Amino acid sequence: MKRWIVAILVVAGCGGSGVSGDKACTDLATAVCNKRSSCSNGANVVKIFGSMANCLTRTKLTCTDALAAPGNASTPAHEEICATAWGGATCDEFLLGNEPADCVVAGTLADGAACEYGGQCASSYCTNEKEAQCGSCGMPPLMGGDCTRSSCARGQICFTDTVTNTMTCIVDGASGASCGRIAPCNPGLACIGATATVNGACMAAAVSAGAACDNKIGPGCARDLGLFCNTMSATCTTVQYAADGAACGVTASGDFVDCQQGTCYGSVGTTVMGVCKTDAADGAACDTVNGPSCTTPARCVPASGTTAGTCYLPGTVSC
């Protein structure tokens, strides 16, 4: 299962002509959050941020922090160009983390230098940044590599297997591709005919609530649009979003309950049936395995040798 976080690489920097940093970051946040909402019928906004207002605030926060990051080669004017590019991006590009070329810049920091954002680095990637105050400039994990602590390359997603609690960089399957528990499909497609031991095939998904569905023979339902195939009614139903402490997973009536601005956790790690834990606030306690996670863009930085830590907001220290 994917936690469905789309990582937006912020490459803002100081300087530029005409537009202010505040205006550029407001416009970028608006473009990104509008795309997040329109590509998911609002479901991705609720899942990651809880509300559009919080999406705008937290996305802008990422941008304004990056303005002060050393080594960043971009300008507020460039962020305006990036905002326009995100407005014209396809939903597949957005949901698969395929950042527009107009949003990518190479910074001045060499490999190995401390960083928080890819735009600081000559490689345009900041690695090992997920569970630390500072990462280091370098290259992202290879396809199939572990992404527990590093973001994947553009065009790849970090897939979480809730059975093994591992995180791997993958590319979702196109129409007709083999699919299964650890091989999901592109947005707009559903995995049909898969079992616990046998893969199925990616097929076009139904895109509206109330449409007929069948996970064995097709069509399935578009999960990226917040839909779930209720096997009891054989129709696509809208995913429900629950608050902290509520049960998550498939209900007795066959509907699916996910977590609003949070993640579903079992006794150990993430799961598809468990209890919701809302993402923790900046500075609050977190746990990289048992939750809660932190409110984006904060990172859970664990104490040495443990999984328990504190939600750290980038910009608290200079990297």
Where are these regions (language model features)?
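Bacterial signal peptide processing site
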Residues: 15-17
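Extracellular, cysteine-rich, disulfide-stabilized repeat modules with beta-strand cores
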Residues: 96-97, 116-133, 150-165, 182-198, ...
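Sec-dependent bacterial lipoprotein signal peptides
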Residues: 1-12
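Secreted/surface-exposed cysteine- and glycine-rich disulfide frameworks
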Residues: 100, 105-118, 134, 138-149, ...
